[in-house]
Swiss-Prot record:
Protein name: Antigen-presenting glycoprotein CD1d
Membrane topology value: Single-pass type I membrane protein
Glycosylation sites (chain numbering): 38, 60, 126
Positions in the Cytoplasmic compartment: 326-335
Function (record text): Antigen-presenting protein that binds self and non-self glycolipids and presents them to T-cell receptors on natural killer T-cells.
SMART domains: IGc1
Extra information: During protein synthesis and maturation, CD1 family members bind endogenous lipids that are replaced by lipid or glycolipid antigens when the proteins are internalized and pass through endosomes, before trafficking back to the cell surface.
Quaternary structure note: Heterodimer with B2M (beta-2-microglobulin). Interacts with MHC II and CD74.
Listed Gene3D superfamilies: Immunoglobulins, MHC class I-like antigen recognition-like
Record topological domains on the Extracellular side: 18-304
Organism: Ovis aries (Sheep)
């Protein structure tokens, strides 16, 4: 594996240049999951993100990385992408073969799963930070630091053997270093140019309050709903004046169908202590104009509001039909 990857590296470096980091950065992350059921069956899938967006995927059934965005090629040429695809094809076949060889050398047996995570982030002054870690059954085993493989602090003793074998392969180490510290930052720089409009998209949230099912006698469950915001990072808190309420419970940030996000934050309080509470929302799309909603004790849920509005329309419609019917019948009586 090392010799072949090293030769590929020497050929590739002839056409790849240096990069300059842009002012705004988005972390690039990839995750590889490889499942080994036995000595002959294995599956490897890969996912890649730039910030919150997923520009690539690599399914086990495919020999190439698939573009998920129209701007996924970045500023790389077709030739550069073709060579990268070849590098990863060599890597995947070599990885599977090498893992099977390690299984013969080390304690343990099939089935097992390996997770490999890595990525890079561009920082000011043309600096980048990169990382690469490997885990077995979700427990860290080793990482790539500088130009060497290093065993994780709580890794089993056999991880030292794996690191020793990997560190003897100078060609592969140089290829990994090149991919992490040269190619990854250059790829991210290009993606931030071609995907600029989508990466920097800002959508303002809307927020509303509700009261949930009573958690007990003389107790209230207050809900603060925030929806339709993008990007994902958001800060929502129940407040009393300028003080944060320590009992605030935040749910998971959930995706909407339009690629924006939704969050519900709750607070359980005594009925007599609800007055004076407010929900505060901070988001990048709002600038310094935070959303502040005050609890007045008369809030009803948005669902109930919708039901009431529908009821009003139904009553108006029925009333209109009755009025029309009576008027029409009166005209018939006159004629």
């Amino acid at each position: 594996m090392g010799c072949l990857l090293f030769l590929v590296l020497l050929e590739f470096q002839k056409i790849w240049g240096s990069f300059e980091a842009p002012q705004t950065s988005f972390p690039f992350r990839f995750l590889q999951i490889s499942s080994f059921a036995n000595h002959s069956w294995t599956r490897t899938d890969g996912l890649m993100w730039l910030g919150e967006l997923q520009p690539y995927t690599w399914r086990n059934e495919s020999s190439t990385i698939r573009f998920l965005k129209h701007w996924s090629q970045g500023t790389f040429s077709d030739q550069q992408w073709e060579q990268l695809q070849h590098t990863f094809q060599v890597y995947r076949s070599s990885f599977t073969r090498d893992i099977r060889e390690f299984v013969k050398m080390l304690p343990g047996d099939y089935p097992f799963e390996i997770q490999i995570s890595g990525g890079c982030e561009l920082l000011p002054r043309n600096i980048s930070e990169s990382f690469l870690r490997a885990a077995l059954q979700e427990k860290d085993v080793l990482s790539f630091q500088g130009m060497s493989w290093v065993s994780a602090p709580d890794a089993p003793p056999w991880s030292q053997v794996v690191c020793k074998v990997l560190n003897e392969d100078q060609g592969t180490k140089e290829t990994v270093h090149w991919l992490l510290h040269d190619i990854c930052p250059e790829l991210v720089k290009g993606l931030m140019q071609t995907g600029k409009s989508e990466l920097e998209k800002q959508v303002k949230p809307e927020a509303w309050l509700s009261s949930g099912p009573s958690p007990g006698p003389d107790r209230l469950l207050l809900g603060c709903h925030v929806s339709g915001f993008y990007p994902k990072p958001v800060w929502v808190m129940w407040m009393r004046g300028e003080q944060e309420e320590p009992g605030t419970q935040q749910g998971d940030v959930m995706p909407n169908a339009d690629s924006t996000w939704y969050l519900r934050v709750t607070l359980e309080v005594a009925a007599g202590e609800a007055a004076g509470l407010s929900c505060r929302v901070k988001h990048s799309s709002l600038g310094d104009q935070d959303i502040i909603l005050y609890w007045d004790g008369k809030r009803v849920s948005r669902g109930l509001i919708v039901v009431l509005v529908i009821l009003v329309f139904v009553l108006l419609f029925v009333g209109g039909l009755v009025f029309w019917f009576r008027k029409h019948r009166r005209y018939q009586d006159i004629s």
